[in-house]
Regions:
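Short amphipathic alpha-helix adjacent to the substrate-entry channel of hydrolases
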Residues: 113-131
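Short beta-strand/loop motif that positions the catalytic acidic residue
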Residues: 260, 265-268, 272
Length: 327
């Protein structure tokens, strides 16, 4: 496929999302760069059949998998319990594969109850255990705290495989948006024991979150008020990713790619107005450059998590990817 990276006009403007301490998810007035699809598969799933809600065979809610502390903000040092929801198959003849789901939320929230719920329910219906986890976000921690949370969640899953009837040796990581970012960063830095990883419209280089957008939006992402800046430096630091790029690059999964990662699947809408489409491309291309295995889908005319991201077509691609790399 040819490289189509010329400027385009996508002039639908959405309001910024503002969280605690003024942490802001800046949205563009327009998308000015057309996605490079030269190493990706372009699909149009917007008007295809949608997933239907599914009732889990069994689901345990609000399990405390970690007793932690708030490490940033005005409540620093106070107790913070982190929870997990897990859908599982207690009566399956043999243990199922296990999917660890890391929810998105712009680094300012992580909702384990609703984030990507249709996809999780339908993965569970296809005989997977699916565990969704909370983690530190802006206002109660830093990005590196979240990496520790993921490690602790994985340890919890390792220690409870018999209780929930899954095979921990068949661990899959799935995340969307901010959760996609952590799917990439954690898996690339800690590949041992992970069979494959699925990153849906996730961030990567936090100095380039707005690189595909109008200049005002791009520059706003570099300021102290952006959620990514507060996540790296702290909500009261007054520093932006544009002030200390060296420190920001420590949080960039691209910089840790070796080519020895588990297989990756990326999916990203070409009209995403929260996370520049090029963010997943950076990781995908680096993995390919290093000789690793990565597949990337670009969803035509789809915004952030919308359109084809709750389609049966998407689910089928995910199921095939898992089957090809786990079973």
């Amino acid at each position: 496929m040819e490289n189509n990276s010329q400027r385009i006009d996508k002039s639908i403007s959405l309001p910024n999302r503002v969280g605690k301490y003024g942490a802001t998810l800046f949205r563009p007035k327009e998308i000015v760069t057309k996605p490079d699809t030269s190493t990706s598969i372009v699909v149009e799933w917007k008007n295809t059949k949608k997933l239907s809600p599914q009732v889990p065979v069994k689901e345990d809610l609000n399990i405390i998998y970690k007793n932690s502390l708030i490490t940033d903000g005005e409540n620093k040092g106070q107790k913070l319990d982190l929870h997990m929801n897990i859908m599982y198959h207690p009566n399956s003849d043999k243990p199922t594969d296990i999917i660890l789901f890391i929810p998105g939320g712009g680094f300012i929230s992580c909702d384990i109850n609703s984030s990507l719920l249709l996809v999780r329910q339908n993965l569970h219906k296809n005989n997977y255990a699916v565990a969704a986890i909370e983690y530190h976000v802006v206002g109660n921690g830093f990005y590196y705290d979240a990496l520790e949370d993921i490690k602790d969640a994985i340890n919890f899953l390792r220690n409870n495989e018999k209780k929930y009837n899954y095979d921990f040796s068949k661990l899959i990581i799935l995340g969307n948006s901010a959760g996609g970012y952590f799917t990439a960063l954690y898996t690339i830095k800690n590949p041992q024991g992970i069979k494959c990883a699925i990153d849906l419209y996730g961030l990567s280089d936090l100095t380039k979150v707005g690189i595909d957008y109008d200049e005002e939006c791009y520059k706003n992402h570099l300021t102290k008020n952006s959620s990514e800046s507060m996540y790296i430096f702290g909500c009261l630091s007054g520093k932006g990713v544009g002030d200390d790029e060296n420190e920001a690059q420590k949080a960039n999964p691209v910089n840790y790619v070796t080519g020895k990662e588990p297989p990756f699947l990326f999916m990203h809408g070409d009209s995403d107005r929260n996370v520049s489409n090029s963010q997943t491309l950076l990781v995908h291309n680096k993995i390919l450059e290093k000789g690793g295995k990565s597949i990337r889908y670009v969803l035509k005319d789809d915004d952030h998590g919308r359109g084809g991201f709750d389609s049966e077509e998407m689910l089928n691609v995910i199921l095939k990817f898992i089957n090809d790399n786990v079973n």
